[in-house]
Each structure stands twice: as C-alpha cells, then as structure tokens.
C-alpha cells in the first residue's frame, strides 16, 4: 500500500466508517432472535443430543462390549464393564455415561461397529441434582426404546453422507 493510500485511510477513518455502516445496516433489519421455549428452530439430522443405547428388532441389545466408545471418549465420560455369557458372547453388565463430563463430540457414535450407542436429537433434558445427569445402562436403553423410530429415521437421512 502506498503512503498516500495509507494517509487517506487513516485520515478519513475509512475502517471506522465501514464498521459503522455495517452496524447501521443491521440496526434496521428484521431481528432474528428466537424466544426459545415458545419458538423452536429446526434441528439438523446430525444434531448430537442425549445419548441412547439401541436394541435389535428381536429385543436383544446391540452393544457387544468392545469398549471402543470408552477408549475413544476424550472426556472419559463412559464407563463399561462386561462379562462373557454362556454362549461365548460378550455383553455389558454396566454402561454408564456421565453427561456432566460429556462434550457431545460424537466419537462414541462414530466408533461403534454395531450402531449401539447413538446421540439423539433430544436437547431438552435436565437434572435437578448432579447425579441426575449420570445415565446408567437401563436409562440409556429406555431412551433408545422410546425414540427408536426417530433414531432410525435420522440414521436413514444421514446414510447417504457416511
């Protein structure tokens, strides 16, 4: 930049005027604020919300206790204990997720070879005490059973992009 251009930019404060013009444009535009509990915005099919454990159509849980999700979790929010059954298959006896630690990165869902752990599109959940956000295997299976149709639809919508 030449010295003359630099002089005119600093003397006439062009950057300041550009910023004020931008502020002025947004002052008179329609506002985009959403009043959350009453109004809702559309949720992406890839939204990562509350976790759920899925079952097969015959009612058997999908988790094979490979512990990949526990290993890949950067926040160490997943705890898994497993045992071998009589038919030599491994299943979980304990599958806990501490949502106060979870950063909702989706690594657990991506690493699962059988699509057992998924993150649903549920974003409205709360806990009155700290322990309320500690989800056990039974709670995760209940979420999966309740929202299986929504989970399957979201998986089908996202399938072409995987």
Curated annotation (Swiss-Prot):
Binding-site residues for [4Fe-4S] cluster 2, renumbered to this chain:
73, 102, 105, 108
Q: Which InterPro entries match?
A: 4Fe4S_Fe-S-bd, 4Fe4S_Fe_S_CS, NADH_quinone_OxRdtase_chainI
Q: What class of enzyme is it?
A: translocase
Q: Which domain of life is it from?
A: Bacteria
In its keyword annotation, does this UniProt entry include Membrane? yes
Q: Which Gene3D superfamilies match?
A: 3.30.70.3270
Q: Which positions does UniProt annotate for [4Fe-4S] cluster 1 binding?
A: 63, 66, 69, 112
- From the UniProt record, give one GO term of the biological process aspect: aerobic respiration
Residues in 4Fe-4S ferredoxin-type domain copies:
54-83, 93-122
Give the EC number(s) under which this enzyme is classified.
7.1.1.-
**Chief place where the protein resides:** membrane
Q: Where in the cell is it found?
A: Cell inner membrane
Could you tell me what this protein is called?
NADH-quinone oxidoreductase subunit I
């Amino acid at each position: 930049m030449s010295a003359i251009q630099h002089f005119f930019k600093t003397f006439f404060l062009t950057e300041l005027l550009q910023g004020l013009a931008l502020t002025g444009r947004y002052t008179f535009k329609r506002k985009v604020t959403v009043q959350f509990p009453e109004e809702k915005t559309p949720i992406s099919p890839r939204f990562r919300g509350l976790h759920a454990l899925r079952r097969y159509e015959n009612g058997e849980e999908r988790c094979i206790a490979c512990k990949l999700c526990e290993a890949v979790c950067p926040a160490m929010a997943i705890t898994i204990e497993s045992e071998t059954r009589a038919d030599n298959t491994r299943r979980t006896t304990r599958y806990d997720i501490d949502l106060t630690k979870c950063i909702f990165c989706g690594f657990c869902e991506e690493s699962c070879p059988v699509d057992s752990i998924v993150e649903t599109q549920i974003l409205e959940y709360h806990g009155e005490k700290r322990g309320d956000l500690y989800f056990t295997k039974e709670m995760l299976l209940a979420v999966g059973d309740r929202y299986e149709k929504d989970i399957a639809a979201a998986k089908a919508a996202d399938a072409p992009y995987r």
